[in-house]
Amino acid sequence: TAVSMDGYTAYGASITKDGNKETYDCPAPYGFVMDPEIAAEAPKELAASGYADLIAKIPAAADWMLADVTGNEKIDDFSWHLVQDGLKEALSAPAEVHAGDIAYTEKLGEGLLMSGFAMQALLSSRPASGTEHQFSHCWDMENLCFEGKHVSHGFKVGIGTLASTASLEFLLEKDIENLDVDACVEAWKSWEEQEKEIREVFAGKPGHLARGLKE
């Protein structure tokens, strides 16, 4: 009934348990039906949330490229193309989506559905999320509200996208060729220092503390 996020066709469910945001495996839907005419008439905030969730696939893709080149998470071509091939077109007309244009609402919806299918294909949220979603999860764990109301997933991801993109631009401005890797590693905090900081930040929050120490 609304193009509000990409989870409709995804395999997993991101749930807050004991104060922590965790992703649980769950069966994907056998089928999905969306009427673009109905979706185009949904509250504008829902479409805006979906647009923000979909535009997050841009910095998420950059994160995946970094993970691939560093040998941490290899890019899966099939799921990559499910998300990225139609992304530009799906994001091409935000004003028209806001105005309730049926055709462009359908394109946005297709982009979100393909993102969910990509997560199904890889059994991972990697094709559809990156650092920007980590911001959203942190805010979920803090019960973020605006004017007394909980903030939608898409809006949180949208703000996370701005922060993630700024971080990527900051990285691109650095002189990587002359980076002294050994000096950077030497300057990194020891585990003892990190553990002390984690225990201070999550004091009084046992669930958060256990997750912080684990990760």
Residue ranges and their predicted role:
Residues 80-214:
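Active-site segments that bind and position negatively charged phosphate/pyrophosphate groups
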